[in-house]
């Protein structure tokens, strides 16, 4: 196995490298007769697309998606719909600058997958990182746009809630604010602070990490599975598969270790439309199965390892040397990871929805 596929019923296989001709994915398991136009996928891709502000990589990629298979005009309406067969999506790479990486061809970047790819395969694609580049995540976003079409009534949203040691004020959370700043930040005041803060990081040639929060509202109670098919286990695996992610928590997460049983357990009351929870420390999942509350997942993204300051390393021959990375890189890769996290949430939920239908109807 080469481990380029995730999902069970809703399966996504991605392909391509950062500096290759193109990247893409094949989505298998999508039900038939779901309306799907390239423009619907493009909306999500444009949110992740690089070069839209000085706070992301200046690599200029239009990320125009092409649907190669799995769709046709509906015989009744004429609208383009899915056929139930594999959907192949292609995104061409148009702004590669492989020469920027020639000086590190034989050197390993500290904190990067260079060393481990070399250890596993005996070589690695130094040109932009190959498959280990965040460029690959554009394909996940494209797949996530299809997954959203399956999730009728479910709203998946994400936000950047921390950059470096600086956290947002949750009392000022405004979902509408996210579209007004380049950080996907729901706190207007903190977004203004991040602008100056990240400018300083960027101008110094360094980078910084971040924490992102992804939520899903409208997920029906009962979605998921116990033990080895847990919804939260699959969500954690999906988020950990994103480049640069080093930690995942659901609901109260690690803070639950500081709570008593009385504080942590989400008490329940009867309501007109079913059961009402008085809190959501569980993050919308108990025993691997959705409670019907909002699902809340947070993940930590490490600082970009390709930075402009000299670092000590070794080369392929094992000789000690110094490395300074050129090229165009995100000073905070967490910014563009918000749409990626949303996509992975959508893909996992779509997969579990189809599995749920297969088991209980």
Curated annotation (Swiss-Prot):
Names of required cofactors: FMNH2
Record-given protein name: Chorismate synthase
HAMAP family membership: Chorismate_synth
Its biological purpose: This reaction introduces a second double bond into the aromatic ring system.
Sites where the protein binds NADP(+): 48, 54
EC annotation from Swiss-Prot or TrEMBL: 4.2.3.5
Name of the gene encoding the protein in the UniProt record: aroC
Reactions accelerated catalytically: 5-O-(1-carboxyvinyl)-3-phosphoshikimate = chorismate + phosphate
Species of the source: Bradyrhizobium sp. (strain BTAi1 / ATCC BAA-1182)
A GO BP annotation: amino acid biosynthetic process
Matches recorded under Pfam families: Chorismate_synt
Family annotation (NCBIfam families): aroC, PRK05382.1
Swiss-Prot/TrEMBL keywords: Amino-acid biosynthesis, Aromatic amino acid biosynthesis, FAD, Flavoprotein, FMN, Lyase, NADP
Subunit structure as annotated in this protein's UniProt entry: Homotetramer.
SUPFAM superfamilies: Chorismate synthase, AroC
GO molecular function: chorismate synthase activity; FMN binding
Cofactor: how and how many bound: Reduced FMN (FMNH(2)).
Protein family according to the UniProt entry: Belongs to the chorismate synthase family.
UniProt GO cellular component terms: cytosol
InterPro entries for the chain: Chorismate_synth (IPR000453), Chorismate_synth_AroC_sf (IPR035904), Chorismate_synthase_CS (IPR020541)
Binding site for FMN: 131-133, 243-244, 287, 302-306, 328
Pathway assigned to this chain's UniProt record: Metabolic intermediate biosynthesis; chorismate biosynthesis; chorismate from D-erythrose 4-phosphate and phosphoenolpyruvate: step 7/7
């Amino acid at each position: 196995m080469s481990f380029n596929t995730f999902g069970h019923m809703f399966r996504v296989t991605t392909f391509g490298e950062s500096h290759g001709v193109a990247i893409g994915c094949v989505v298998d398991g999508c039900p038939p007769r779901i309306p799907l136009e390239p423009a619907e996928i493009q909306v999500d891709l444009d949110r992740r697309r690089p070069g839209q502000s000085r706070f992301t990589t200046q690599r200029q990629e239009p990320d125009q998606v092409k649907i190669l298979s799995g769709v046709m005009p509906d015989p009744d309406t004429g609208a383009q719909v899915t056929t139930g067969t594999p959907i192949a999506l292609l995104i061409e790479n148009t702004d590669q600058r492989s020469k920027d990486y020639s000086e590190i061809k034989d050197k390993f970047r500290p904190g990067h997958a260079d060393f481990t790819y070399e250890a596993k395969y005996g070589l690695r694609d130094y040109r932009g990182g190959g498959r280990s580049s965040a460029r690959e995540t554009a394909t996940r976003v494209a797949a996530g746009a299809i997954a959203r079409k399956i999730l009728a009534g479910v709203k998946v949203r994400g936000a950047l809630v921390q950059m470096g040691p600086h956290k947002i004020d949750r009392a000022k959370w405004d979902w509408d604010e996210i579209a007004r700043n380049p950080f996907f930040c729901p706190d207007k005041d903190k977004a203004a602070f991040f602008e100056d803060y990240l400018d300083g990081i960027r101008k110094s040639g360094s980078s910084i990490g971040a924490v992102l929060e992804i939520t899903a509202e409208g997920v029906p109670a009962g979605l998921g599975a116990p033990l080895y098919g847990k919804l939260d286990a699959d969500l954690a695996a999906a988020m950990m598969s994103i480049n640069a992610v080093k930690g995942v928590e659901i609901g109260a997460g690690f803070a639950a270790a500081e709570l008593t049983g009385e504080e942590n357990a989400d008490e329940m009351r009867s309501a007109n439309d079913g059961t009402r929870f008085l809190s959501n420390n569980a993050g919308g999942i108990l025993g691997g199965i959705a409670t019907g509350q909002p699902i809340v997942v947070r993940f930590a993204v490490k600082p970009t390892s390709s930075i402009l300051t000299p670092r000590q390393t070794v080369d392929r021959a094992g000789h000690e040397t110094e490395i300074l990375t050129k090229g165009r890189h995100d000073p905070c890769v967490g910014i563009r990871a918000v749409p990626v996290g949303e996509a992975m949430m959508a893909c996992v939920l779509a997969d579990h929805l189809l599995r749920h239908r297969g088991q209980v109807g």
